[in-house]
Swiss-Prot record:
Gene Ontology biological process terms in this record: translation
Taxon lineage: Bacteria, Pseudomonadati, Thermodesulfobacteriota, Desulfovibrionia, Desulfovibrionales
Assembly and oligomerization: Part of the 50S ribosomal subunit. Contacts protein L20.
Record gene name: rplU
The keyword Cell membrane is assigned to this record: no
A GO CC term attached to the entry: ribonucleoprotein complex
MF (Gene Ontology): rRNA binding; structural constituent of ribosome
Family recorded in the similarity comment: Belongs to the bacterial ribosomal protein bL21 family.
The entry's keywords: Ribonucleoprotein, Ribosomal protein, RNA-binding, rRNA-binding
Known function: This protein binds to 23S rRNA in the presence of protein L20.
Protein name: Large ribosomal subunit protein bL21
Length: 103
């Protein structure tokens, strides 16, 4: 069974036992989180599509850890103007593990 969930403004395809990084959540490591914004649930040929979300469906997850991604460099240069800026950014994330998908 798989599901397409929405969290942090992004969509993810998840299955039971999968670990993935999502945008930072306000939950301690080791706690259980229920995600209820389920866009689609599928199992073989049987597919339920929400409008916009599937009624009564939820995905149970466990928060594994919090962390920060690799640094990206934002470099802007204006040619012939002797002007340039360099800035770094590290995005916070939460690593979750999908425990169960309930239709």
């Amino acid at each position: 069974m798989y599901a397409i969930i929405e969290t942090g403004g992004k969509q993810f395809r998840v299955e039971e036992g999968l670990e993935l990084n999502v945008q930072k959540m306000d939950a301690e490591a080791g706690t259980k989180v229920d995600l209820d914004k389920i866009l689609l649930i599928g199992q073989g040929e049987d597919v339920k599509i929400g409008a916009p979300y599937v009624e009564g469906a939820k995905v149970s997850c466990t928060v594994v850890e919090h962390g920060r991604d690799k640094k990206i460099v934002v470099f802007k240069k204006r040619r012939r103007k002797d002007s340039q800026t360099k800035q770094g950014h590290r995005q916070d994330y939460t690593r979750i593990k999908v425990e169960a998908i309930q239709a």
